[in-house]
């Protein structure tokens, strides 16, 4: 019999409570989630529902109260972290480093020689449209450019799993749309597994093949995304597609139902 492929991420009936006291409810309760290798998954939900906590658990930065978490079959937190490139909220660039040296940080942390790391960082910045800013400080870049540099750093780490926490959350609508298109193009050829947290339903649908809704510490919804169905179509055309609008409406209706249920 052929072997069952090992998923990139497996979250098996996981609970997380910061305290056993009954007045402190669990952050996550019986969360079960499997992400096949190469899939792009978006996790949406209201503030405080446990989205970022779930990412930290997957990446080995937190330990669950109960349940099992594996990344590429490994349960040990250090091994899980070794498979993941983490992109926290905000650009998190080091202000005293050049943009190029910021992007090279993951390579330098893994012992890659400085000259080689800088060369690879420069090539990635060229792909990202930031080649002219390689020797600049982060303070000289716009918010969108800093976010693009942070994404470039995460992608240059060349890890099989990318964990992104609100990667475009602090950007204006126009810049967000531009970077969504750019990121979709990069992800299409990367082969990486993406687990992304976002509060933006359009962003979730555009950048993922699957969208799950987290509410009150539980997974309460699961829908197909539109990443594969975009097929190189411009973002504006996809947003105007009646099928996309129907997907958005269904998810927003579920979000609204969650809001009414917890009100």
Regions inferred by a protein language model and the residue ranges of each:
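Conserved ABC ATPase "signature" region
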Residues: 108, 115-133, 185
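Conserved ABC transporter NBD signature motif
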Residues: 67-80, 120
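Conserved ABC ATPase signature
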Residues: 137-141, 145
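Catalytic Walker B motif of ABC-type/P-loop ATPase nucleotide-binding domains
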Residues: 162-165
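Helix-to-loop junction immediately C-terminal to a conserved catalytic motif
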Residues: 59
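The feature captures the beta-strand-to-loop junction immediately N-terminal to the Walker
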Residues: 44-46
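A short, proline-enriched helix->beta-strand linker immediately N-terminal to the Walker B motif
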Residues: 156-160
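Short coil-to-helix segment of the ABC ATPase nucleotide-binding domain corresponding to the Q-loop/switch region
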Residues: 97-104
